[in-house]
Amino acid sequence: LYVDTIDGYEFLRPSAWVEVKGSGNDIFYRNPGNVEENCFVAISSPSSNVYTSVRDVGTPEETARKILKQTLIELTSTRLGIVRESEVLDAKEDVDKDGNVFYDITLRIKSYAAKNQYGLTPEDRPQTLEWDRTFYSRLGTENGRLYELRMQSPSEEFEESKEQYLVGMGKSFRPFEVDAPPPSVGKQLGLNFI
C-alpha cells in the first residue's frame, strides 16, 4: 500500500514494482520485469480549478477525450515521420461504497514510425508499428483537487495486466482529506502548495 499523507491519496501497488525518481509526477512506479508497464499519480494544482466532484471535469466521455488529447501531447515526438492512432476504449463512472464518484477511462494509442524519414515519396517512407499501448486512468477528487492514477501496459498484454495489476490498483486508489489550509488561505499566507 502506498500512502501519501501530504497530498492525500493511497493505492495498492505490486511489491515488486520500483519507484522511479525525477519523473515529474507526484509518484511513479515501474514494473522491473516489463518497463512498459508503469503507473503514476498526477494531481491538479491547488491554485487551478477547485474540484468538488470528478463531474466538474465533464461527462466520462468528455473527460476521456480531454485525457486522450493530453496524453497525445505528452507523447509528442520531434522525430520526423511519427504517426499516432488513438481511441477511447471505455469511459465510465464508478461510485465506491462510501459514495465517492470516480471516472474509469481506458485509452489505446499506437505509434508508427517511418524507417526512412527522408524518403522522397510515401513509398520511400513506409510506416511500421513502433509501439501499441493501453492506458487506464482512474480519476477522483478531494481537497478541491483532481487526482489521476494512470497506468499503462502494452496492449497485447493489457488484459492479463488488467486482471493482475490494473484493476486492483485502480479500485484501491482513493484520495482522502488532508489537514491543510485551503488554497485561498495558502495564497494569502504566501504559501505555494504543489
Predicted segments, located by residue:
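Stable alpha-helical elements in mature extracytoplasmic
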Residues: 13, 63-64, 68, 162-169
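Generic low-polarity alpha-helical segments
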Residues: 2, 147, 172-176
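Short aromatic-glycine motifs in intrinsically disordered, low-complexity regions
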Residues: 1-10, 73-76, 161-164
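A short, hydrophobic/aromatic-rich structural module that often spans a beta strand
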Residues: 154-175
